[in-house]
Amino acid sequence: MESVQELIPLAKEMMAQKPRGKLVKLYVLGSVLALFGVVLGLVETVCSPFTAASRLRDQEAAVVELREACEQQSLHKQALLAGGKAQEATLCSRALSLRQHAS
């Protein structure tokens, strides 16, 4: 069935042949399921831009969180390196001062 215009003559022809009740119920069930599928397809088409936008926002938020974590980690490493260098400088100056006293 390519169009609704072909569906109406088919329904008229079926009613003219006086089909059994079970057959009519089967056709009605098939038609309802097909209509339900069309409605779901339309809803999905209408709502897909919104879901794509929310996915994009979620991805951007995840990227921002990763960048912040990397920045915090690099700052922590820099602080450790700076603290280590200061500690080494203190140890070296102590070692030199102790050596001067020993000689």
Swiss-Prot record:
Q: Which organism is it from?
A: Mus musculus (Mouse)
The subcellular localization recorded is: Mitochondrion
| Disulfide bridge map | none
**In the UniProt record, which is one GO cellular component term?**
mitochondrion
The identity of this protein, by name, is: G0/G1 switch protein 2
Q: Output the InterPro entries linked to this UniProt entry.
A: G0S2
How does this chain assemble?
A: Directly interacts with BCL2; this interaction prevents the formation of the anti-apoptotic BAX-BCL2 complex.
A single GO BP annotation from the record? positive regulation of cold-induced thermogenesis
GN (gene name): G0s2
Protein purpose: Promotes apoptosis by binding to BCL2, hence preventing the formation of protective BCL2-BAX heterodimers.
Q: Which UniProt keywords apply?
A: Apoptosis, Mitochondrion
Superkingdom, natural source: Eukaryota
Q: Which Pfam families match?
A: G0-G1_switch_2 (PF15103)
